[in-house]
UniProtKB/Swiss-Prot annotation, chain A:
Record-given protein name: Superoxide dismutase [Mn], mitochondrial
Modification comment: The N-terminus is blocked.
Cofactor note: Binds 1 Mn(2+) ion per subunit.
Pfam families attached to this UniProt entry: Sod_Fe_C, Sod_Fe_N
GO molecular function per UniProt: manganese ion binding; superoxide dismutase activity
UniProt family annotation: Belongs to the iron/manganese superoxide dismutase family.
Catalysed reactions, semicolon-separated: 2 superoxide + 2 H(+) = H2O2 + O2
Major localisation: mitochondrion
Protein purpose: Destroys superoxide anion radicals which are normally produced within the cells and which are toxic to biological systems.
Gene3D superfamilies: Fe,Mn superoxide dismutase (SOD) domain, Iron/manganese superoxide dismutase, C-terminal domain
Requisite cofactors: Mn(2+)
Gene: SOD
Keyword set, alphabetical order: Antioxidant, Manganese, Metal-binding, Mitochondrion, Oxidoreductase, Transit peptide
Cellular component per GO, a single term: mitochondrial matrix
Length: 210, 228
């Protein structure tokens, strides 16, 4: 039973590259502290699981499930999130680079604007910590749905997380305080539509190996 | 419009009567049937250095006030549905009542179980409560470290409470997700807000420091009153 140790994936851009939508300070804390903590706790849970498996300790194995779900989910969600963001004004932020996804969005919600509105309403309706996702149901090129997951619950296979938005307060609070609507409005300026198109058309085989 | 009305009515109410709820939050006030944001009994900066003035101000004026406003909006919809005998809508509104009503209750209780050091914040409990803590946890310090562990273990947003079991009279530590309020079998004695907005501007990801600093501004006199 080998247990692979997970490490913090580097960001595909500089900490200040998402400004003014997300500040450098938020990105540094979010990546270096919050994401790192999920990874540390995931590694600890995996190592405890390996020992419990070796000794066939079923009660311990069961009691570890929630830690795995929370910290593994935290690692997966943040890994997906960093990659589905891009600095504002880059070509990747242009929805024209996501033709198949755009067509599917328009056929599902009537227009890109209607989708943006529906997605925002879903995000702002979250009660507590969680994530908002555009999900392709059942696999690549599936029916699109707006889904929220609580705390660090991930989007489970076979559903495909096309892109996700972190709605934990630590994702925006230092900059937006209680104005989470301002954060939700700004997020569209940094969505990586090219990455979203790739996930929608080809699926996500392993969110930790994007 | 409704917010304006209740606001001015609240000013008028302040000098007069204030309603007391059965949940034990002495500061729950209503004006013309609407919940209103209770005043704090101390200044925003009075809990420093445990909790910064900026945090207290945003937390009270913005976060708590949003729960109050949203609760009142929910209540209006609920009353409309009741008047029409619309059962489906009444049921659909339950999560909103729980979340916004819970947020209002929790924060009201929280402000009251905090106090500046100059007003007795951090002074250990005495009497029956002190005895109950010692006999349940061994010592106040033991209780505090168990409470801090419970707070640190919350996955997501939520609260940790010292509660009294109404059936047995025993005290215990319980955590609640999001704004779920302490109702039913348990009575809230002491609540600590573990939402990130309660500490992030000052402590960022170092939430353990917030949990350890808050004991300096706990109003044990309020907790004793709730216990007895």
């Amino acid at each position: 039973m080998t247990s692979q140790t997970h490490t913090l994936p580097p960001l595909p851009y500089a900490y200040d590259a998402l400004e003014p939508v997300i500040s450098k300070q938020i990105m540094e804390l979010h990546h270096q502290k919050h994401h790192q903590t999920y990874i540390n706790n995931l590694n600890a849970a995996l190592s405890a699981q390996a020992s419990a498996t070796a000794s066939n300790d079923v009660p311990t194995l069961i009691s570890l499930q929630q830690k795995l779900r929370f910290n593994g989910g935290g690692h997966i969600n943040h890994s997906l999130f960093w990659k589905n963001l891009t600095p504002p004004g880059t070509p990747a932020n242009d929805i024209a680079g996501a033709p198949a996804l755009r067509e599917a969005i328009v056929s599902r919600w009537g227009s890109h604007e209607a989708f943006v509105k529906a997605f925002g309403a879903e995000l702002l309706g979250l009660q507590g910590s969680g994530w908002g996702w555009l999900v392709s149901k059942g696999g690549a090129k599936g029916r699109l749905e707006i889904v929220t997951t609580k705390d660090q619950d991930p989007v489970n296979a076979p559903d495909v997380p096309v892109f996700g938005v972190d709605m934990w307060e630590h994702a925006y609070y230092l900059q937006y305080l209680n104005n989470k609507a301002g954060y939700v409005e700004g997020i569209w300026k940094i969505i990586h539509w090219a990455e979203a198109e790739k996930r929608y058309t080809a699926g996500v085989e392993n969110p930790l190996k994007l | 419009m409704a917010a304006l009305l209740s606001n001015s009515a609240r000013v008028a109410l302040r000098s007069g009567a204030s309603a007391t709820s059965k949940a034990g939050a002495a500061g729950l006030t209503f004006a013309r049937g609407k919940a209103t944001l209770p005043d704090l009994s101390y200044d925003y900066g009075a809990l420093e250095p445990s909790i910064s003035g900026k945090i207290m101000e945003v937390h009270h004026k913005n976060h708590h006030n949003t729960y109050v406003t949203s609760y009142n909006n929910t209540l209006e919809q609920l009353q409309e549905a009741q008047a029409k005998g619309d059962i489906a809508t009444q049921i659909a509104l339950k999560p909103a009542v729980n979340f916004h009503g819970g947020g209002h209750l929790n924060h009201t209780l929280f402000w009251e179980n905090l106090a500046p050091k100059s007003a007795g914040g951090g002074e250990p409990p005495s009497g029956a409560l002190s005895k109950a803590i010692d006999s349940t946890y061994g010592s106040l310090g033991e209780f505090q470290s168990k409470m801090n562990a419970a707070l640190a273990g919350i996955q997501g947003s939520g609260w940790a409470w010292l509660v009294k079991d109404k059936q047995t009279g025993q005290i215990g530590i319980r955590t609640y997700a999001n704004q779920d309020p302490v109702v039913g079998q348990f009575q809230p004695l002491l609540g600590i807000d573990a939402w990130e907005h309660a500490y992030y501007l000052q402590y960022q990801n170092r939430k353990a420091e917030y949990f350890s600093a808050i004991w300096d501004v706990i109003n044990w006199k309020t907790v004793e009153k709730r216990f007895t």
